[in-house]
Structures are given as structure tokens and as C-alpha cells.
Regions:
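Short, high-confidence coil segments that cap the C-terminus of an alpha-helix
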Residues: 40-41, 68-69, 94-95, 114
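Long, largely alpha-helical accessory region at the distal end of helicase-like NTP-driven motors
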Residues: 42, 180-202
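Conserved RecA-like P-loop NTPase helicase motor core
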Residues: 76-181
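Conserved interdomain hinge at the start of the Helicase C-terminal
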Residues: 7-64
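Short, flexible loop segments at the rims of nucleotide/cofactor-binding pockets, characterized by
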Residues: 19-25, 74-78, 95
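Residues at the starts of beta-strands that form the adenosine-phosphate
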Residues: 42, 70, 144-147
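Short amphipathic
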Residues: 1-7
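Conserved RecA-like helicase motor-core motifs
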Residues: 44, 62-85
Length: 202
């Protein structure tokens, strides 16, 4: 949940304006970084935009992790053979982090030994990702459970519900349909800045 001033400023914004604000929000990116670093096990962080989000996230995460913890970056810029090498390495690790674009996993997440998935960018294409991973979020053959952290961005005001909040409701329908167990945790995102066309800051 964002500061009330931010919610009112975002009221009526286009979908692209909403996304641009979300992926460049420093407090949100810090939250994703802390969540990712604090998680135990192999963690996949997924993003949609390479330059303005993916590269920012991977740098923040690399700065925050303890020395020796492996952090990998995967986007369309990375050769398919290198992606396979990364996947093979991670399958042998127990505490690695992969920061990857949604496009590179649009046909499914094929990494065994994956403990956590973090959706870093709200995207309508996440529905396709959820459908493709299907059984991957259920208990695996060896008893391991993969946990998904889906960040829903709430800018709603009286009489207005923002795009990404509505999309998160669609994903929850999929969780219910697929039989996933889920919990909703409210997060008060402190220190969020106002959209750039406003001179004030919070």
C-alpha cells in the first residue's frame, strides 16, 4: 500500500504511467532487494523491463548479499547456452539468486531445486507464467515446496481501483483454481516518492 498522497496522484493514470512509476520506485526496489536477500534457498526474481528495472534490481541485490553468495542475471541479452549453464549451476547450489526477465521464462520455469520465486514487476504476462509453471508451485517429487512472492501494488482510492491491483486479483483467481495455498500480507511502503511531475516528495 502506498502513501495516500501517492494514491491520489496516481488516480486516473494510464497503465504505462502506473508501471513506469512502480518499476522506478526506490522504496519498492529496496523492499524487493531486502525480501530477496533475506529468503533462504535458491531464489528467482522476475522482471519485465531490462534497462529500467532488471539491471537496477540486480545491482541492488549484488550490493546487499553476503560475500560468496552467487547472483546471476538472465535476460534476452544472455545467450541461450549461457542461460543453460546458469540453470545447471543453480541446480547444484542451495542459496543462489537469479534475476531474470519474464520473457526468458515465458514457456515455463525449468529450474529444479528452486525454493522461491519473486515477481518483481507487475505484468499481465504473469498469468501466462503462472499457467506454465503450474505444478512447479506445488510440492515437488522430493518434498520441496516452491514459494511464490507476488507483489500487488495498491494505489486504490474511493471509487478508483488501479490497473495493477486489478491484475493481482486475476492472479489470485489462478492461485485458487490451481489449488495453491496463499496468504495476503499488507505492506506499508514507506518513503515512496510522488510521481515525477509533482515537485513535492514524501
Amino acid at each position: 500500500r502506498y502513501h495516500n498522497d501517492v494514491c491520489h496522484m496516481m488516480n486516473g493514470r494510464t497503465y504505462q504511467e502506473e508501471i513506469d512509476y512502480i518499476v522506478t520506485n526506490e522504496a519498492r526496489n529496496r523492499f524487493i532487494t531486502k525480501l530477496t536477500v533475506d529468503l533462504k534457498g535458491n531464489t528467482l526474481v522476475m522482471f519485465q523491463f531490462v534497462e529500467k528495472h532488471g539491471k537496477v534490481l540486480v545491482e541492488l541485490i549484488r550490493e546487499a548479499v553476503e560475500e560468496g553468495r552467487k547472483v546471476f542475471y538472465v535476460s534476452g541479452e544472455v545467450d541461450a547456452s549461457d542461460r543453460e549453464k546458469i540453470r545447471g549451476i543453480v541446480e547444484k547450489e542451495n542459496d543462489a539468486i537469479i534475476v531474470a526477465s519474464l520473457g526468458t521464462f515465458s514457456t515455463g520455469i525449468n529450474i529444479r531445486n528452486l525454493h522461491n520465486i519473486v515477481f518483481g514487476t507487475p505484468s499481465k504476462s504473469q498469468v501466462k507464467v503462472l499457467q506454465s509453471i503450474g505444478r512447479g508451485l506445488r510440492q515437488s517429487d522430493n518434498g520441496q515446496v516452491t514459494k511464490l512472492y507476488d507483489i500487488a501494488d495498491d494505489f486504490h482510492t474511493k471509487g478508483y481501483k488501479n490497473f495493477t491491483l486489478k491484475h493481482s486479483a486475476e492472479r489470485i483467481k489462478i492461485y485458487t483454481k490451481e489449488g495453491f495455498r496463499y496468504k495476503v500480507y499488507p505492506i506499508d511502503l514507506k518513503g515512496t516518492q510522488l510521481p515525477k511531475d509533482n515537485d513535492d516528495a514524501i
